[in-house]
Regions:
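Active-site environment of divalent metal-dependent phosphoester hydrolases
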Residues: 1, 24-28, 45-57, 71-74
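Binuclear metal-dependent phosphoesterase catalytic core
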Residues: 8-12, 34-35, 40-42, 64-97
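Generic alpha-helical hydrophobic packing signal
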Residues: 15-17, 43-44, 55, 82
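Active-site neighborhood of phospho(di)ester-bond hydrolases with catalytic His/Asp-centered motifs
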Residues: 17-20, 43-49, 64-66
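A short helix->loop->beta-strand "cap" motif at the edges of active sites that frequently abuts
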Residues: 60-61
Length: 97
C-alpha cells in the first residue's frame, strides 16, 4: 500500500511529525518538512529525502534528519538517528559510522 505524506506520533507529551520531506513549500528539505506540519503544533519533525544528517530548530520545533546508513550523498560518514524518550525528556542524536 501507499504511505501517507505525513504522520503524527504521540510519545507521552512529545508530539512527533514524520515525513519523507520532498513535498510541501520551501527552498530546502528542512523548510519543506517544517511547512508540512505548520498547522499541527508538533514538538519535533523527523524527515529524510536529502540523506544528509540535520539537527536544528526552526521556530522552536526540533528538525531531525537521521541521514542514511546506505548513501552518504557527499557526507564523510554514513549515519542513523537514535531517539531516547524518558518521562518528560527526550534526546535525539546522530550515530556516524
Amino acid at each position: 500500500g501507499e504511505l501517507p505524506d505525513k504522520a503524527i506520533v504521540q510519545f507521552g507529551e512529545l508530539k512527533v511529525g514524520i515525513t519523507h520531506g520532498y513535498q510541501g513549500k520551501g527552498s530546502s528539505t528542512p523548510d519543506r518538512a517544517y511547512n508540512t506540519f505548520i498547522e499541527d503544533q508538533v514538538d519535533m519533525i523527523v524527515f529524510g529525502h536529502s540523506h544528509i544528517p540535520y539537527k536544528n530548530y526552526i521556530n522552536g520545533v526540533l528538525m531531525f534528519n537521521p541521514g542514511s546508513p546506505t548513501e552518504k550523498r557527499g557526507q564523510p560518514y554514513f549515519s542513523i538517528g537514535l531517539m531516547t524518550i524518558e518521562d518528560d525528556s527526550y534526546d535525539v542524536r546522530h550515530v556516524f559510522f
